[in-house]
From Swiss-Prot:
Keywords: Aromatic hydrocarbons catabolism, Isomerase. GO terms for biological process: beta-ketoadipate pathway. Homodecamer. It catalyses: (S)-muconolactone = (4,5-dihydro-5-oxofuran-2-yl)-acetate. This is Muconolactone Delta-isomerase. Pathway: Aromatic compound metabolism; beta-ketoadipate pathway; 5-oxo-4,5-dihydro-2-furylacetate from catechol: step 3/3. It comes from Cupriavidus pinatubonensis (strain JMP 134 / LMG 1197). It comes from the Bacteria.
Length: 92
């Protein structure tokens, strides 16, 4: 199942830099692991924002929820999920 996911990150302004750096490093490692597994298929930065659009390919809504809630930045994110279906005019 394919999903388009927008993630907006809002770290607290008073979060110590070392804590923020640790969370970001763990986030990067987890995101890259999911990409290597083929579950996080595409990742795009939103220009000028601390946000991204991503394409996930997972087996169920529950699996996606588990993956997203496992992100170290999850407590600081606003997430919008859009399930995708193949378009009848697509040649792919």
């Amino acid at each position: 199942m394919l999903y388009l996911v927008r993630m907006d990150v809002n770290l607290p302004h008073d979060m110590p830099a070392a804590q923020a750096d640790d969370i970001k490093a763990r986030e990067k490692a987890y995101a890259q692991q999911l990409q290597h597994e083929g579950k996080w298929q595409q990742l795009y930065r939103v220009v000028g924002e601390y946000a991204n659009y991503s394409i996930f390919d997972v087996g169920s809504h529950d699996e996606l929820h588990t993956l997203l809630s496992g992100l170290p930045l999850f407590p600081y994110m606003k997430i919008h999920v859009t399930p995708l279906a193949k378009h009848p005019s697509s040649i792919r």
